[in-house]
Each structure stands twice: as structure tokens, then as C-alpha cells.
Swiss-Prot record:
Gene Ontology MF: a single term: ligand-gated monoatomic ion channel activity
Known role: Probable gustatory receptor which mediates acceptance or avoidance behavior, depending on its substrates.
High-level lineage: Eukaryota, Metazoa, Ecdysozoa, Arthropoda, Hexapoda
Gene: Gr92a
Glycosylated residues, chain numbering: N54
Bilayer-crossing regions: 15-35, 80-100, 142-162, 170-190, 257-277, 288-308, 357-377
Pfam families, per the entry: 7tm_7 (PF08395)
Localization in the cell: Cell membrane
Extracellular topological segments: 36-79, 163-169, 278-287, 378-386
GO CC entries: membrane; plasma membrane
Protein name: Putative gustatory receptor 92a
Principal place of residence: membrane
Membrane topology summary: Multi-pass membrane protein
Length: 386
């Protein structure tokens, strides 16, 4: 087994895991399209029967979850827990409504976006004739593996947090809870993998410019043949065209999925507050499991932040890949057009204009979370001593 993993490259392994994540998203009813392969061309298309099956299934499971959750809230004696659980229930309604709306009304836009991603990966890969096919490198593999760990936790956490014995009723309740929670969390993972993909596209294109095109530009001068100059000119224009297409794809992705990210972040913060309250105030005997659950949600936010930061950094590195372009003024004019585009189209991920997704924001959130948990635990100990 270890020999197999050693022989398998990081890009190929990442591609295999992404294929599993695609099937997982189909299984939980978030993805309603299928992948169709025609020789070297891969496209996605809508399966109408799968879409309406997912819509019906989601309505049924959420209805069951809604009434069971109301019953569990009514028997709780702690007012704070009642409020937090009630907020989670209320917030789950727009999450489910948004998923249903995306399934019914925005399917063609999502299909166009996914096909655009696949087309860009093919075009960037064609620049490297001998490059090993796959997705990214070791950094991307590590982040995808962390996403995979998060998926595994979503499937099993309820089995360890519920103390009652297993039964058919428990299995049904677990499935309804899992179907809702996993679909909400997938918003986080879609944004994480989406911006990770944009970062890979920028990184691969930057690598080609730095290792191939830049050298060709620097060697050219006015004495070069017109055919050679024209060939390099075409490659330069091709790269600039790809930069623009990647940027426009990022805008499409932002418009489609960042509103979903906003809902998922609110839901995630509320869950973290709920779990933190249970850990710091109630002091469950199995609090270690709740600490793992808390760490899982913090990990999800970390993955989104790192993916966004990676894409932003690769975008900012575009201008530094070209260097001196030689003596031909036409190349400098073409690059000036690119640099103007970079200045006008600054790459950033803003959550509805409220804040940008950055490492600084993540660290501030983490600091606030730890301070809040410490305050609640200290208050609990003072009340207990009193």
C-alpha cells in the first residue's frame, strides 16, 4: 500500500480525492449534475431526475428534522441552550431554501461555471506538453486531505455524541440531521475547493510564464525573424487571455457561491457558540468529543481562509513573472494592457461587502472564540465555587 502511495504523485492523488468528493456531494443531494467524458473533453450536464429526487428528498428530511428538533428544544431547561438551538433551527430554514432555489432556478449558471473551470484546466494543462496530469501539488493535496477529514467527521459525529442506543428511529433522525448539516457545510467546502482551484490555475499559468515565456521574451530582439516574433506574440496573448478568463471565472464563482458562504459562516459561528457553551459551561463527561467537534468547525474556516489567501497571492504574483521583456515595444504595450487590467480588477473575496476573507480576520475570530470560552468557563467556576 505504501509503495502504491509513493508511486502515485500528489496531483494524481488530489484528482482521485476530488472525484470522491464529487460523488459524496452527489450523495448528499447538493450536486445534481453528472460528469460526461468524450475522449479528452470532460463536461457536466444536468440530470433532471436527479435534481427533482434531491429536491423531494431534502424537503422530506428537513420536515422530519424540523419537528424532531423542536421537540428536543422544548425539553431543555437551560434558557441559553434553548435560544442557541432555536437560532440554529431558524437559520437552517434559509439554508435549505437557498439550496432548493439553486437546484430549481440556477442550475444552468452552475453548469456553465463548472464547464468553464474544466475548460480552463484543459487550456492551462495544454501549455505544459510533458507535465504530469493532475490537480496542484503537495500543498493542495494537504488541504484536500483536511477537507476529507472534515467530511468523515460530518458522517460520524452524531454516533458519538448521542448516548442512547441505536434504533431505526435513531438512524432516521441521524440521516435527517446529517443530510442538513452536510449540505450546509458543503457550502464551505465548495468555496474552499473553488478558490483552491483558482489558485492552482493562477499558479500553473504563472509557472509557465516564468519558466518558458519569460525566457523567450528576454531572448527576443529587433533582429529576430518575424515568424519567431509572431509565435512568441501569440503565446503572450494566449497567456493574457487565460489570465482574463480565470479572473472572469472568479467573478462568476463569487457571485454564485459567496452568498452561500455567508449563510454557512453564520450557521458555522452559531454552531461554534453552541458547542463552546456546552464544553465550557456544561462540562460534559464526553467533552473531548465536543472539543473535536469544535476543532472541526474551526478547521473548516481555516481551509476557506487558506484557499482564498492562496488564490489572492497567486493573482498578486502575476506582474512579477514577466520581468524584462526585451527590446520589442509591442510586447511592452501588450503587457501594459495586462498590468492595467490587474490594477483595475483587484482580486478579493468580500462577504457581501461586510469584510474580506483574510488570515487576519481568521486570527481575530480565533482570538475572540478563545477569549469567549475562557470567560464562560471562568464564570462557571466562580458560580460553582459560590
Amino acid at each position: 500500500m505504501f509503495e502504491f502511495l509513493h508511486q502515485m504523485s500528489a496531483p494524481k492523488l488530489s484528482t482521485s480525492i476530488l472525484r470522491y468528493i464529487f460523488r459524496y456531494a452527489q450523495f448528499i443531494g447538493v450536486i445534481f449534475f453528472c460528469l460526461h467524458t468524450r475522449k479528452d473533453d470532460k463536461t457536466v450536464f444536468i440530470r433532471n431526475w436527479l435534481k427533482w429526487l434531491n429536491v423531494t428528498h431534502r424537503i422530506i428530511t428537513f420536515t422530519r428534522f424540523f419537528w424532531v428538533y423542536i421537540a428536543s428544544i422544548s425539553i431543555k431547561t437551560n434558557r441559553v441552550l434553548q435560544v442557541l438551538h432555536g437560532m440554529r433551527l431558524v437559520l437552517s430554514i434559509p439554508n435549505v431554501a437557498v439550496i432548493l432555489c439553486y437546484h430549481i432556478f440556477r442550475g444552468p449558471e452552475i453548469i456553465d461555471l463548472i464547464n468553464q473551470f474544466l475548460r480552463l484546466f484543459r487550456q492551462v494543462s495544454d501549455l505544459f506538453k510533458t507535465k504530469t496530469p493532475g490537480f496542484g501539488g503537495r500543498r493542495e493535496l494537504i488541504l484536500i486531505l483536511l477537507n476529507l477529514i472534515s467530511f468523515a467527521h460530518e458522517q460520524t459525529y452524531l454516533w458519538f455524541t448521542i448516548r442512547k442506543g441505536f434504533s431505526w428511529r435513531f438512524l432516521i433522525d441521524w440521516w435527517c440531521d446529517f443530510y442538513l448539516v452536510s449540505a450546509t457545510n458543503i457550502f464551505i467546502h465548495i468555496n474552499s475547493i473553488g478558490y483552491l482551484s483558482l489558485g492552482v490555475l493562477y499558479s500553473e499559468l504563472n509557472k509557465y510564464v516564468y519558466t518558458n515565456l519569460r525566457i523567450q521574451l528576454q531572448k527576443l530582439n529587433t533582429s529576430g525573424s518575424k515568424q519567431k516574433i509572431r509565435r512568441v506574440q501569440n503565446r503572450l496573448e494566449k497567456c493574457i487571455s487565460l489570465y482574463r478568463e480565470i479572473y472572469h471565472t472568479s467573478i462568476m464563482f463569487h457571485k454564485l457561491f459567496v452568498p452561500l458562504l455567508f449563510l454557512a459562516l453564520i450557521y458555522k459561528v452559531l454552531l461554534i457558540a453552541l458547542i463552546g457553551f456546552n464544553v465550557a459551561v456544561e462540562f460534559y463527561l464526553n467533552s473531548f468529543i465536543f472539543w473535536i467537534l469544535l476543532g472541526k468547525h474551526v478547521l473548516d474556516l481555516f481551509l476557506v481562509t487558506v484557499s482564498v489567501e492562496g488564490a489572492v497571492n497567486q493573482f498578486l504574483n502575476i506582474g512579477m513573472q514577466f520581468g524584462n521583456v526585451g527590446d520589442l515595444s509591442k510586447f511592452q504595450t501588450t503587457l501594459d494592457t495586462l498590468f492595467l487590467h490587474l490594477r483595475l480588477g483587484h482580486f478579493r473575496v468580500s462577504i457581501l461587502g461586510l469584510f474580506d476573507v483574510t488570515q487576519m480576520q481568521y486570527l481575530q475570530f480565533l482570538s475572540a472564540l478563545l477569549s469567549g470560552l475562557a470567560f464562560i468557563a471562568q464564570y462557571r467556576m466562580q458560580v460553582g465555587n459560590g
